[in-house]
Amino acid sequence: MTYFEELINTKPKQPSTMVASISSKVLQIRKENIKLSLSDLNTVDHRQEYIATVDGVMYYDDSRAENVNATWFTFQNIVKPVVWIAGGDDSMADFKDLKKVVRQKVRAMVCVGEGNAKLKKAFHKDITELYEVENMDEAVNLASLLAQDNDIVLFSPACKSAKGETYTERGNQFTETVKRMEHERHQ
């Protein structure tokens, strides 16, 4: 019997049964619509975007986080230890608001590119494993060596690119390097 047939065949002396039936059907329809709506939501590219899990390590691209506040908010959503890839033109950044969360969550840090003097100085006492590399390939490869099972490798630069690249270009470099590494390790 369909929902509408059930309504038509309901006797007047059963109003509470009818209300209960209608309510449960409406709630079920709402639940299904909510599930469908949520499943259609896509993440915003380069904003806390999951890329892959390689050898038990999860890789996330947060290249849109080109300032301290954006990176801080990303760290608020993370509960696992992090190998943090950051860097760029740090001349305008003030990293003091990140220090506490970095001490709590970051296992190691990889500074990528040029212009990271202020970034390294800000965290050299908080992170025992702090490295500097020249490009994204080196950053991802080093981060994969530093990461342990169930860690997160997070690319969240906390500053603009020193080379004038967009966050999209840097995020794509990160994603391509991770995907290439994933492919090589699973052949």
Predicted regions located by residue number:
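Internal alpha/beta core interface subdomains
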Residues: 15-23
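Short, conserved micro-motifs enriched in small and acidic residues
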Residues: 10-15, 65
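A short glycine-threonine-serine/GTX helix/turn-capping micro-motif
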Residues: 2-12
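ATP-dependent carboxylate-amine ligase
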Residues: 22-30, 36, 40-46, 50-187
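Local beta-strand/beta-hairpin segments that build beta-sheet-rich folds
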Residues: 1-2, 51
